[in-house]
């Protein structure tokens, strides 16, 4: 038993200090906790997301990386873009004008195609209304980073286990439990202070936990006050040429509560409550070239999210199941924005584009709300038939989401003294899609079969999904949609998967998987509509949208030596009926909205393909010293149009040199870079194409004793001026846009955090 465990230990490849079965049996392991990217280490790490059950990372036939609480504290990120900055296959575009980090992009797939969960509960949808006014956006609201004990990222389609919305991958956040604070004591806690010069933000965290073997509790609270994220711009004017950031005041606060009840050795209950809210005030001093009559503007955003869940776990001593887990949950999220504009020398109707002699004040409001109710049930069973070991899981997921959106506006013409609720042909309030309900039900099963004394693993899986979209009758949408009523929609889909892993030697694992993916069209894509008759454009609903479907083939290899660990993966993802918003040929297309020059609509694209390769590795060349690195390459095409996919980033890489003592002291120098942007779809307009870059960060950390730890960092050490392609394309920056330095990344900044444990 011990010899077999040692062989499996040599084949492990990931980064985080999770002590598992082999460690418990006395197997030696190298303790290493990287400060930067999720690198590879000789620990028998356990992951959950890839199989929905605890599994050794080296036994997973997919690409998955993790970060733990210590790595997050040392990296000191302020948003998801910072959290995943050293992962070259992950991109988190920021709206540098106002809203910040929005949605996660994995291997060129983003937005609501990447499933994000906190403690098994899906985060709210990402919504972006677009347009030059930039007033209607709602992010997915990642959890408070100081509450996290772990983050797992699974690449590629995961619909066979998680259903719709996981067609591009899964990001799973796990929050801390009482035991993470008590550390074996009856009572424990932590206090934290952090400051980051990237946005002059100062944060405070506090947590306490305690209890007995039967009952345990935890409560944590966090608060942060910050300002605008820095860049390398110098023009401080209130104009279209401004390059310095728009001034911001940002406040966020959060709290987390947990109660764990071990009613008996076999029965455990878990109650969780999480709250987050934030407010941002922005002086929108950089003006839009598309809105020449807007001469001053400011914005305010409020967001809130509340989640409550009750979990149950049953582990019988014997019986039909080894484990039964269930969770019921409710989550409510809301984003509201208010934008105030001064429009000068404008028309009597206060147009943003038409010249006139009027002076106007325009107030524009936006609200997006989701209420989510659901449950999941999963059973696990291990057994043997002949010489084959089986690990069977199966279960059901159900989720009901009620979504609503609205826009409002008040227009005051200061020259004529009139006030109206009409602007640019729209009569407020208005809905861009009807309020309604989406239901998703999924049944899944997977059998992990081990042959030849565990050296070969074959895992078939299958999931059945049914979804239904039920809009309310909504006159506020009907008029915008050209008199086309909102439609209900439902569909069912099977998502199979087959993966294989072969332990070729004690040091080499080879794996492959063939996975089917699936995503149902959402409320905005099916029933969304918009009209701007003054400027002559709009968006039409599409009741005929089909679900997206994908087929993904991925192969990989992992090698683990005494001082070298490395892995490589090759993937080819093909998407059919990919949903994308396109401009219609008007007026010949029957879907065109009457009276408008241009109509946009979500359409199914016949074929989209993304393929690429990734490499990760670590080399411990001396005691306490190691080098790690990662490279990601992807190539994407819309095969219907022959155009590149703008969501695919150029080749990117990261590397680091780390010195670390087991006592908790260490330092790292990290580099990350990208090739120049050359492949873009410029059919609508010509994008500004960022040059390649390479930046260096320094990190240091010191654990003085079991109670006090300090982390310091210098980001962009050499004050490099550079742009990220994700930020550029998210905003739609053209090659002729003035003041592109507005979209540059921060220069040299400093950060520090102090943590007290008791």
Segments the model singles out, each with a brief description of its role:
Residues 34, 379, 451, 458, ...:
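Gram-negative outer-membrane beta-barrel transporters
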Residues 197-226, 236-283, 304-306, 386, ...:
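Transmembrane beta-barrel wall of Gram-negative outer-membrane proteins
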Residues 262-264, 391, 397, 431-574, ...:
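Structural signature of Gram-negative outer-membrane beta-barrels, strongest in the C-terminal barrel
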Residues 244-402, 565-567:
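Outer-membrane beta-barrel domain signature, strongest for Gram-negative TonB-dependent receptors
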Residues 36-181, 555:
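Acidic, small-polar-rich N-terminal luminal/periplasmic segments of exported/outer-membrane proteins
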Residues 227, 313-314, 322-341, 503, ...:
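Membrane-embedded beta-barrel scaffold of Gram-negative outer-membrane proteins
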Residues 130-134, 146-150, 155, 160-233, ...:
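Outer-membrane beta-barrel translocator/receptor signature
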Residues 126, 518, 574-576, 676-680, ...:
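C-terminal beta-signal and adjacent terminal beta-strands/loops
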């Amino acid at each position: 038993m011990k010899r077999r465990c040692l062989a499996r230990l040599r084949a492990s490849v990931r980064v985080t200090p999770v002590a598992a079965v082999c460690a418990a049996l006395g197997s030696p392991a190298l303790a290493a906790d990287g400060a930067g990217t999720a690198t590879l280490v000789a620990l028998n790490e356990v992951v959950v997301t890839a199989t929905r059950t605890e599994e050794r990372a080296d036994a997973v036939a997919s690409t998955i990386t993790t970060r733990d609480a210590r790595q997050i504290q040392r990296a000191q990120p302020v948003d998801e873009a910072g959290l995943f900055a050293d992962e070259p296959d992950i991109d988190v575009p920021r709206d540098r004008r106002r809203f910040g980090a929005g949605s996660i992009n994995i291997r060129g797939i983003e937005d609501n195609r990447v499933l994000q969960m906190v403690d098994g509960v899906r985060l709210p949808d990402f919504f972006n209304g677009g347009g030059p006014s930039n007033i209607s956006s709602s992010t997915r609201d990642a959890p408070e980073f100081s509450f996290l004990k772990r983050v797992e990222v699974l690449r590629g389609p995961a619909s066979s286990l998680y259903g719709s919305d996981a067609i591009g991958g899964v990001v799973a956040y796990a929050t801390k439990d009482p035991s993470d604070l008590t550390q074996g004591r009856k009572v424990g806690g932590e206090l934290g202070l952090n400051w980051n010069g990237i946005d002059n933000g100062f944060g405070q965290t506090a947590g306490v936990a305690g209890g007995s073997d039967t009952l345990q509790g935890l409560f944590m609270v966090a608060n942060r006050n910050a300002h605008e994220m820095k860049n390398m711009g110098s023009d401080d004017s209130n104009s279209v040429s401004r390059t310095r950031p728009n001034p911001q005041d940002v406040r966020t606060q959060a709290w987390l509560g947990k109660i764990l009840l071990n009613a008996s050795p076999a029965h455990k209950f878990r109650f969780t409550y999480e709250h987050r809210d934030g407010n941002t005030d922005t002086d929108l001093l950089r003006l839009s070239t598309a809105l020449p009559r807007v001469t001053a503007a400011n914005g305010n955003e409020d967001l809130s999210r509340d989640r409550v869940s009750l979990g149950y776990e049953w582990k019988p001593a014997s019986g039909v199941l080894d484990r039964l887990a269930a969770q019921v949950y409710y989550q409510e999220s809301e984003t509201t924005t208010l934008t105030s504009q001064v429009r000068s020398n404008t028309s009597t109707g206060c147009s943003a584009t038409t010249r006139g002699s009027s002076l106007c004040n325009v107030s524009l409001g936006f609200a997006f709300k989701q209420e989510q109710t659901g449950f999941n049930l999963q059973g696990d069973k291990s057994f043997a038939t002949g010489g084959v070991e089986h690990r069977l899981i199966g279960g059901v997921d159900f989720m009901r989401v009620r979504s609503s959106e609205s826009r409002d506006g008040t227009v005051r013409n200061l020259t004529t003294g009139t006030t109206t609720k009409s602007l640019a042909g729209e009569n407020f309030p208005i809905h861009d899609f009807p309020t309604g309900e989406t239901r998703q039900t999924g049944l899944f099963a997977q059998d992990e079969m081990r042959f030849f004394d565990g050296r070969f693993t074959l895992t078939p899986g299958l999931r059945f999904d049914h979804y239904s979209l039920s809009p309310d009758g909504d006159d506020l949408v009907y008029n915008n949609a050209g008199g086309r009523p909102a439609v209900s929609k439902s569909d069912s889909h099977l998502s199979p998967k087959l993966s294989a892993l072969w332990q070729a030697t004690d040091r080499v694992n080879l794996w492959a998987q063939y996975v089917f993916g699936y995503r149902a069209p959402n409320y905005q894509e099916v029933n969304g509509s918009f009209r701007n008759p003054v400027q002559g454009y709009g968006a039409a609903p599409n009741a005929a949208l089909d679900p997206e479907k994908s087929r993904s083939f991925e192969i990989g290899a992992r090698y683990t030596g005494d001082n070298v660990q490395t892995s490589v993966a090759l993937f080819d993802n093909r998407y059919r009926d990919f949903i994308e918003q396109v401009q219609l040929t008007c007026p010949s297309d029957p879907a065109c909205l009457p009276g408008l020059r241009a109509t946009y609509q979500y359409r199914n694209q016949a074929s989209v393909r993304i393929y690429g390769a990734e490499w990760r590795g670590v080399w411990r060349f001396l005691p306490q010293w190691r080098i790690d690195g990662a490279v990601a390459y992807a190539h994407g095409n819309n095969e219907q149009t022959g155009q590149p996919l703008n969501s695919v980033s150029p080749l990117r890489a990261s590397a680091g040199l780390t010195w670390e003592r087991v006592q908790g002291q260490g330092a790292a120098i990290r580099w990350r870079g990208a090739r120049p942007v050359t492949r873009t779809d410029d059919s609508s307009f010509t994008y500004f194409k960022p040059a390649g870059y390479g930046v260096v960060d320094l990190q240091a950390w010191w654990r003085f004793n079991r109670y006090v730890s300090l982390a310091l960092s210098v980001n962009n050490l050499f004050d490099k001026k550079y742009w990220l392609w994700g930020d550029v394309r998210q905003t739609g920056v053209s090659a002729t846009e003035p003041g592109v330095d507005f979209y540059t990344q921060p220069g040299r900044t400093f950060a520090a955090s102090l943590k007290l444990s008791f």
